[in-house]
Curated annotation (Swiss-Prot):
Family: Belongs to the UPF0145 family.
Xref: InterPro entries: UPF0145_dom_sf (IPR035439), UPF0145_YbjQ-like (IPR002765)
Signal peptide range in chain numbering: none
SUPFAM superfamilies: YbjQ-like (SSF117782)
Top-level taxon in the UniProt lineage: Bacteria
Pfam family, one: YbjQ_1
Matching PANTHER family: UPF0145 PROTEIN YBJQ
Biological source species: Clostridium kluyveri (strain ATCC 8527 / DSM 555 / NBRC 12016 / NCIMB 10680 / K1)
Gene3D superfamilies the UniProt entry points to: Hypothetical protein apc22750. Chain B
Lineage: Bacteria, Bacillati, Bacillota, Clostridia, Eubacteriales
Protein name: UPF0145 protein CKL_2433
Length: 106
């Protein structure tokens, strides 16, 4: 399946629009990762534990989006947008939402 942030796919004609599809993931950040990120914040640098959590959540959201596109008979998703939001009282949950337009291309 082709997935792209652009509104068209070069060299491909859109034959049918199937509608908007979404993939959502809410991921909790555990205490160990939170402590490691605190040290990184204090000493400077990148938090590999949070980055890994973010990457995994994004990949899962895109996979869910593709599965939903397949379910409506699409073979591509165009105009993909990915949004991130921190949730929970302590900001210990991450929501990743991927959205796009499911289409059938030639």
């Amino acid at each position: 399946m082709i997935v792209t942030t652009t509104n068209c796919i070069e060299g491909k004609k859109v034959l049918e629009y199937k509608g908007i599809v979404f993939g959502e993931v809410i991921s909790g950040v555990d205490a160990i990762k939170d402590i490691a990120a605190g040290f990184t914040n204090f000493f400077g640098g990148r938090s590999k534990s949070y980055e890994g959590e973010l990457i995994q959540a994004r990949e899962e959201a895109l996979e869910e989006l593709k599965n939903r596109a397949y379910a409506v008979g699409a073979n591509a998703v165009i105009g993909i947008d990915i949004d991130y939001e921190v949730l929970g009282q302590g900001g210990n949950m991450l929501m990743v939402t991927a959205s796009g337009t499911a289409v059938v291309v030639e």
